[in-house]
Amino acid sequence: SLLFALVALYSYFLGKKSFLSFGIFLIGITVLRLLAFPIGNSMRLDVPLFSPNLYADSGIFSSLGNLLLNNLYVFLFVLAVYIMRKQIAKLKRELPVALKYIFTAVLVILPVIAGVYIHETFQSLINNSNITLEIYRIEELDIYSILCYVSYGLLFIAFLLLLQVALMMTSLSGRISFLRTKYLLVYIFIISAYTLVAISYLGYKKEEARCRMWTNRLSVERD
């Protein structure tokens, strides 16, 4: 039922593309996310996706299922902002000068917030889960690994869309587009390098801490 409600909200928003439908869509997906949280918690013992044995952090990131739903929520929010980019640009032109600068600053800050969110949650996923993310360990990859890659793939797309919206608010709008092939290739290279370094470094530190823990435990048992 939540999925049908989401499809209905998105269809309504896509059909209208107004600030009213934009607001209704954001309120709607927020309500759906809040409703999904207790439902997910009630399945902690029955569904591995929501089990703390697979992944657990604090608050709204208490399970992998909640993490993936949070990521989906962020992606849908950004997608809605991108769909409204022309209306947003038009609104900016109609604002007084003072408000125009504030409006632009908010849109420029959004990619920064998104970047911090991606980095922090990705770091949390590596440090607080038993999910294999290293591509070279292909035989150990499972459905949860794939779900994580798809989820963060959507977040990296969302980050790119936010950069494009922020660019539209500057004097470079019309001359540069991050969606052109050469910029996309550079972006893909940067994201690939980031994920590779993050997974390798944090995975190594995690394994090092685990080995140190076992070493300490063995030394205590010998004593």
Model-derived segments and spans:
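Juxtamembrane extracytoplasmic/periplasmic/luminal helical "stalk" adjacent to the first N-terminal
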Residues: 117-120, 191-223
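Juxtamembrane segments at transmembrane-helix boundaries
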Residues: 1-177
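N-terminal signal-anchor/signal peptide hydrophobic helix marking the start
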Residues: 175-191
